[in-house]
A protein has these predicted regions:
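Substrate-binding/active-site clefts of carbohydrate-active enzymes
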Residues: 1-201, 221-229, 234-239, 245-246, ...
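Active-site-proximal helices and loops of the catalytic beta/alpha 8
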Residues: 103-104, 108-111, 131, 193-200, ...
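Active-site glycine-centered loops adjacent to acidic/histidine catalytic or metal-binding residues
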Residues: 117, 337-339
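Active-site neighborhood of divalent metal-dependent phosphoester/pyrophosphate hydrolases
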Residues: 120, 303-310
Length: 341
């Protein structure tokens, strides 16, 4: 059928062929290769979100065709289109391996911690569908009850008197995603409850997606509530900006004391190790004594990840990049595959 989730090739002019469906990756696959990761000296694994996503490919889009700017024809294989944040997506668990089993075996058999990818800003694509599709724009609770439904409506058409619309903002956010209202206390309660139960199943740290799309006050409340249950829990976030002054605010205690992925560092490393600029560029992002970050040594450092092109360096450039990554300040994060250059 048109909306099957497996093996959906996508061809966009000017881009390499891609596939937007599920291709079989699951928790068992990660566990089967965990020792390979541990043998390289890594101590933790971060995957994209594990929560339940819609079962079909999205049929709507404000954008023409299937270009990089639109989600038409794509599935939630990546995990960022959550509809039930209390449930594991059915593509990930397998017979004899629940998520709790997975984190326990990572820890006990391979010495690896698991980092959970946290999304509070949005749910799944929620509007522009020719006909409303199951699960899209919906949220379910721990009992499987429907608590929010966008109804395939433009955000501006949502009804203030409809309790199923109360979770959503009235202005569009990212693409056609259901944009969640951080000013609604029920949204905070939903996510605190959801992510607390994943801590009970062996999660060791949080990586927070799209942190800049929600107010600092929300993240302060969220982090306080979560750390009341797990004191000292390490959290780091994605604020996709190359301006240190922008991303540093998240690390301050009054904003939740959440570390960040070091995008300014990524920019400097690509400039030096891929483009061949002066090594002096590397000093600009460290901020060891500027006081900009609450603790610069807790920043997550990287030279590429799943949201961007891989670093295009030659062999010596990759060797130098990894030498720098693993010996300079911060906590190194390596995107799978980059370990071989």
């Amino acid at each position: 059928p048109e909306t099957r989730t497996f093996d959906r090739p996508m061809q966009v002019e000017g881009y390499a062929p891609a596939n937007v469906g599920y291709l079989g990756g699951d928790l068992k696959g990660v566990l089967d290769n965990a020792q390979y990761i541990a043998d390289m000296g890594f101590t933790a694994i971060w995957t994209t979100p594990i929560v339940d996503n819609p079962d079909e490919a999205f049929t709507g889009s404000r954008y023409p065709g299937r270009g990089p700017g639109g989600d038409k024809g794509k599935t939630g294989y990546h995990g960022y289109w959550g509809v039930n944040f209390f449930e594991v997506d059915e593509h990930l668990e397998s017979e004899g391996l629940t998520f709790a089993d997975f984190t326990r075996r990572l820890r006990d058999e391979h010495g690896l911690k698991y980092v959970l990818d946290v999304v509070c800003n949005h749910g799944s694509p929620a509007w522009t569908m020719p006909e409303d599709q199951p699960m899209f724009g919906e949220l379910y609770d721990a009992d499987g009850a429907l608590v929010a439904d966008h109804g395939n409506l433009h955000p501006g058409a949502l009804d203030d008197d409809n309790p199923l619309h109360a979770y959503f903002n009235r202005e569009p956010g990212l693409a056609e995603l259901a944009d969640l209202n951080e000013d609604n206390p029920d949204v905070l309660e939903y996510f605190v409850a959801a992510y607390s139960q994943w801590l009970e199943q062996g999660v060791a740290a949080f990586r927070i997606d799209t942190i800049a799309f929600m107010q600092h006050a929300y993240w302060k409340r969220f982090s306080d509530r979560i750390r009341a249950q797990r004191p000292g829990l390490f959290m780091f976030a994605e604020h996709f900006s190359y301006e240190a002054t922008a991303i540093a605010e998240h690390t301050w205690p009054e904003n939740g004391a959440i570390s960040v992925l070091d995008f300014p560092g990524r920019e400097a490393m690509n400039s030096v190790f891929a483009d061949g600029t002066s090594y002096s560029e590397l000093e600009s992002y460290l901020h060891l004594e500027s006081g900009l970050y609450q603790n610069p040594y807790e920043l997550m450092t990287f030279y590429d990840n799943h949201d961007m092109d891989r670093m295009d360096a030659d062999t010596n450039g990759f060797i130098d990049a990894n030498n720098w990554l693993f010996t300079s300040r911060g906590i190194p994060v390596v995107y799978y595959g980059s370990e071989i250059g």
